[in-house]
């Protein structure tokens, strides 16, 4: 057959792309590299910040295990089962992230007082309302028929993502809108957005195939890994403010 007359779907598959195994090993390897850098940096942090930084590292380790579960090489099928296991692992990871954010941000907001302190729970309420609306509009239809995912994704979104986003905003405000705190804020926003994209695309209209398409993995990874790297600056931001200024 003349290549020019090949069906469009065959022509689209012709460009070479990385083997699936290589792609996922690269993905997991990068997460392990960031974890290694964070562990090595522990010695540069003050003891108080290092204690909480270790909690964040444990959280990222859970997220890395979640990445393995979500990968196409995990052998966990179909997608609904894969995501059900991932909800638990990422729930632990991001729950730890949110706890440390709260520990860093809340005392500083309290010491500043003023509008930021008075409005802190209003921020949480607004984020919770927005998250709930997003789940209803974009996620609910995808997870219908999968009871654990339906309940789990709703609670995950309402509680953990509300806390992660809200406390990232708190921290940005408490750190006087610094560039390092901006990195943390963007990271705290990208991580939930990546999972919103994941649920919306991996289970479209209730379809439950075995493995997501390569493009869906790649697009989710850009958001997710970018968020993880930016959020990793949280201990650095906190430590730079807790140390006495040199004269």
Predicted regions and their residues:
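Polytopic alpha-helical membrane-helix bundles and their juxtamembrane interface segments
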Residues: 1-247
